[in-house]
Amino acid sequence: MLRGIDHIVIVVNDLEIAIADYGALGFTVVRGGRHPGLGTHNALIAFADGAYLELIAFIPPVAPTPHWWHSTLADGGGLADFCAVSDDMDAEVEAFRHAGAAIGAPFEMSRERPDGYRLVWTLAVTEDARRGITPFFIRDHTPRDERVPRDERVPRARTHRNGAAGARVLALAIGETEFDAARRIYEVALGRTGETVERADLGGAGVRFMIGPHELQLLAPTDPAGAIARRLRTRGGSPIELTLRTAGGWRGMLDAAGTHGARIVMA
């Protein structure tokens, strides 16, 4: 059973600058470490609801090996992917495969934190054009509490000056020709029908699903001049907007320059 969003991936060009900029926006940013063999390093923004944002960048010099994040960076960076947390990763992977998602074979990854602690987990990711539309899945081999910053290890790691308390809504931009297939994947895998949702502010409409405490919105364009249509023209189907839950803090859309291209709303 899916229990919610584990984390949301935000791809940035320069991790050090992103850490400073997100800190200036009122987030507590914790350095995550390096991913051996992948050529990336990250920093994390953890929330009280257990979800977190992963700021991730290629370590200079960027290797010429093709990676789908390069197109995201070429379009300014920002929201790129998301991971779902599950009671049983193997069962969820099979359910999504049965529904039509092209999820590849699980593989092991690791990250070495700045304090030397080595985190190990298994990932299963989508391998076709729906990557970023269907989630990837994770199974921890080391404790999740070591992977995700917590107050016991980093003082006030999950407390933010801007009042951010957790993920609320992740909106996904999906092309008209792909929308029905994407909706079917979720409906079959989750065993329920999505509820109709309209997002005039993004120029889209579609369906929404509750995944634990988090809402996923699958949106197709309704306005050729809207944000969803523009996103589809520049980078295809992908996460387009994240709404964060706040606890009495600042409300509204964060400056896109400070978020390195990620459309983030505080509500």
Give residue spans per PLM region:
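Short, solvent-exposed beta-strand-to-loop segments that form ligand-recognition rims
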Residues: R34
